[in-house]
Amino acid sequence: MSSRHRGRSLALMCLYQIDLVGTDPDRAMKFDWYDKKITREEKDYAVFLVKGVVENRKAIDTLIKKYSENWELSRISVVNRCILRLSILSLQKEPFLAAPVVINEAVELTKEFETEESAQFINGLLDAFYKKEILPKEPH
C-alpha cells in the first residue's frame, strides 16, 4: 500500500470521526486513536487533507450537492461524504495528481470501506465534477 493511499485512509478515518462523532479536528489529527505505525509522510499527507477539508467543507459540500443529482447530503453515508470531500479537495488543490488517479483512489477507498454500489456513485459524481469544474480550467 502506497504512503499516499495510507495517508488518504488515515484522512478518511479522521474525517469520519469529525463528521460522525464531532471530534475536534486538532484532536483527531493527533492520530493517537490509530494503533498502527504511521510514517511522517503518511501523517503529513493525512493532516494536509483533513485541514483542507475542514477549512473548505462548506464549499466542498455545495459541490457535492450540485453533482449528487437529487441526493440530499444527509442521505449520503458519512463514509461516502468523507471520501467525496477529500477527493474533491485533491482534485482542486493537487493539480499535479492526475484526475483519474484521484478518482480511482476514491473508488478503491470506497470499495475498502463501503460497497461496490457506493463505488459507482463516487466514481460518477467525481467524474462529473472533474469534467465540469476542473477540466475546463486546465490549460490545453
Swiss-Prot record:
Quote the SUPFAM superfamilies the UniProt record gives. NusB-like (SSF48013)
**Listed Pfam families:** NusB
* Any one Gene Ontology molecular-function term assigned to this protein's record: RNA binding
Going by the entry's taxonomy, the superkingdom of the source organism is recorded as Bacteria
Keyword rRNA-binding in annotation? no
Q: Kindly list the GO CC terms recorded for this protein.
A: cytosol
- A Gene Ontology biological process annotation? transcription antitermination
Q: Which UniProt keywords apply?
A: RNA-binding, Transcription, Transcription antitermination, Transcription regulation
InterPro entries, per this entry? NusB-like_sf, NusB_fam, NusB_RsmB_TIM44
Per the entry, what this protein does is:
Involved in transcription antitermination. Required for transcription of ribosomal RNA (rRNA) genes. Binds specifically to the boxA antiterminator sequence of the ribosomal RNA (rrn) operons.
Q: Which family does it belong to?
A: Belongs to the NusB family.
- What this protein is called in its record is Transcription antitermination protein NusB
Its source organism is Leptospira biflexa serovar Patoc (strain Patoc 1 / ATCC 23582 / Paris)
